[in-house]
Swiss-Prot record:
GO terms for biological process: cytoplasmic translation. GO terms for cellular component: cytosolic large ribosomal subunit. Belongs to the universal ribosomal protein uL6 family. This is Large ribosomal subunit protein uL6. One of its GO terms (molecular function) is structural constituent of ribosome. Transmembrane segments: none annotated. The keyword Zinc-finger does not apply. The lineage of its organism: Bacteria, Pseudomonadati, Chlorobiota, Chlorobiia, Chlorobiales. InterPro entries: Ribosomal_uL6-like, Ribosomal_uL6-like_a/b-dom_sf, Ribosomal_uL6_a/b-dom, Ribosomal_uL6_bac-type. This protein binds to the 23S rRNA, and is important in its secondary structure. It is located near the subunit interface in the base of the L7/L12 stalk, and near the tRNA binding site of the peptidyltransferase center. It comes from the Bacteria. Part of the 50S ribosomal subunit.
Amino acid sequence: MSRIGKMPIAIGNEAKIEVKGGIITVTGPKGVLDQPMVEEVRIVEEDGKVLVQRINDSKRARAMHGLYRMLVSNMIQGVTTGFTRKLEIAGVGFRAEMKSDLLALTLGYSHMIYFKAPEGIKMETPDQVTVLISGIDKALVGQVAAKIRSFRKPEPYRGKGIKYEGEIIRRKEGKAAGK
């Protein structure tokens, strides 16, 4: 039995879960999320909790058990509280600003980089060196954060670039001067 899969998920009174035609739909105060479902697992709702159960004991069913438990858990958390990723920009002259619905990044290239957020993602810049990405879909928030980070990954010698909040960049020593 999957240690993660067998744990019940508390719904709370804000979220509502529905399974119809092989699609899981979770509705909450922040929005609605859908997820296609595989045949190897089923979702049972009882007294304010959701249980993900597997149909048989095949290798694929065991793999899907824990996966779908976490997918449903993330959907419930997304529609009730949402997800946020914070990016920090380090480097002289590196900055970010919002221009209407575009994120304008100055990252030491000869041109500015403009990034438009996909549907369901909200971006804001509280200051010039911080970008906040928020939304209800955890995977999409992480994907957008990774895309923005890929424009200028942190380099190990000076630490310049875009990094996640709390990310530790392993620093390297530069070339030693010869005798």
